[in-house]
Amino acid sequence: MSIFFIHTMKKTAILVDGAFFLRRYRNIIKDTSPDPVKTANALWTMCMLHLYKEKNEKFNLYRIFYYDCLPYDKKQHNPLTGKAIDFSKTETHQFQVALFEELRKKRKVALRLGILEDGNKWIIKPEKTKALLKGNITVKDLTENDIQFDFKQKMVDMKIGIDIASIALKKQVDQIILIAGDSDFVPAAKLARREGVDFLLDPMWNPIKPNLFEHIDGLYSTLKYKTRK
């Protein structure tokens, strides 16, 4: 009598906190001139490596969800110099728009965009704030590059949490991989694990708090470090 074993490939959803990914990616590869094409390709490769990290088990990609905000595109005046700044013309804005376009071209990538809220204020950069508090510099020593306009992401964490819950409750995947670095995901991760989903965290080599280990099923980073020449 012949016995046939039917192997069903498990499905994986990969959720990416875009702001976290970009911050860690630039730190890891030591790239001072961001390229949207290279960045999109690096993210794609990083995600694909997760599907094949187990020698005896391969996963089928359900979808990559990329969470971020549309870049700020209004005009503001620097309070130190009075200089007008058109944020739609900045390198950051142009990079973000180009990166989103590249990601839209990738197979099975879905953009989930929140809102970048205008804080309506300028803040002194942290390193300069420390210098001021220590008395190493005075306010008169500040330059226009020492302050930055205050932006706050809205709805990104909420979208990540809702998607984790929805995917888990609908039994759409067997595994969820979250590329992120904070603990805001813990309630959603708990729900996913209770629903039988294998929940992995990729912090891109960033240290995580010890208590987070009890809320995940594994920790794994795939992006390779590049040393500065």
Language-model segments: which ranges?
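Domain-level signal for Mg2+-assisted phosphodiester chemistry and nucleotide/NA-binding surfaces
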Residues: 2-131, 144-149, 198
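Nuclease catalytic cores that cleave nucleic-acid phosphodiester bonds
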Residues: 113-229
